[in-house]
Amino acid sequence: MTIVAHSHSFVIGVDTHAKSHTYAVIDAANGELLGCQLFPTTAKGMARAIAWAGRLSSGEATTLWSIECIATYGAKLARAVSDAGYEVVEAPRISTKSRRGIGKSDPIDAQAIATATRSLDDDQLRRPRADDGIRQALRVLVAAREQMAQEKTMNTNALTALLRVNDLGIDARKPLTLTQIGEISRWRSREEPIARVVARDEAIRLARQILAFQETLTTNQKRMIELIAQSPAAPLLEEPGVGAYTAAILITAWSHPGRVRSEAAFAALAGVSPIPASSGNTIRHRLNRGGDRRLNRALHVIAMSRMQHHDNTKTYVEKRLTEGRSKREIRRCLKRYLGRHFYR
């Protein structure tokens, strides 16, 4: 295996924060610190930082940038560095033991990142997700959808609780329907005790917010469908049980060529690969509770939908039930199959 010190001329470690980043440039061959500098996170600040690092590294194309928090604080810098033609990786985790007796500061952290990256094998480098084009657009829509769905649920729960405590003429013993919520949103103020007036006004406000979220979620779903239809993954929408949201999660989880090297690796990423837990004469496996839980949840939703509405899947479920398997075990098998199917 080739390590970074042999395959790259220089390594630049970056300790990232909201207002400023600290950059440390080291010689990959011997680990010598060539310079350490702080720059603001503005576009001009990042351009100056890249130019400064380029001068210290003689503009070598084989310079490797190791950036901390590459999906959050370091995202803009990672894009700028990639656009400048350099290779970018996620900074490795620095162990607490390695910091002992050294202390902690931004320059120390930046140098530690560069030094730790220098000793890694090339296949241990964590390359960032692709963050442009359709995949990044879907990632934004997925995050927005999850936030809106959560807020809609919170408002619905608040409205249900309000109607169960205050007699406003709506039967809230069961979950509220959109028809009932629409009716509430059209209520007018009326002559009644002050407590009921306030409760009714609050119910109207919550109902209107719920309907607004519903409309925005519908628009969000349409945007997802349009983007997925334009991507190479468009056939996903034709798969039984796969909707716009679950298809978007499958696409964004994949992120870039090379992240998943095999079908088994994709199953591990999705958290659907059984983990051996055997000892002596006992042979068994336990659930994989790691991996990308959002991707795992998407496969769960698809499996549940197929178990209810897909004829071939229902036939499979009946067969496995006659063999003595439980519904839970069958669902796990289905999720493992789906991981294999979508990888291929």
Please report, for each region that a protein language model flagged, where it lies by residue.
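Gly/Thr-rich phosphate-binding beta-strand-loop-beta motif of the actin/hexokinase/Hsp70
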Residues: 2-28, 113, 148
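Nucleic-acid-processing active sites and adjacent nucleic-acid-binding tracks
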Residues: 29-60, 64
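Short beta-strand-loop/turn "lid" adjacent to the catalytic site in phosphate-handling enzymes
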Residues: 62-79
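Short alpha-helix plus adjacent loop in nuclease-associated cores
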Residues: 82, 89-128, 179-186, 282-290
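Short, charge-rich amphipathic alpha-helices with coiled-coil/heptad character
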Residues: 119-139, 189-194
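Glycine-rich, often acidic, oxyanion-interacting loops/wings at catalytic, nucleic-acid
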Residues: 141-234
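Phosphate-backbone recognition surface of nucleic-acid-processing proteins
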Residues: 235-238, 244-327
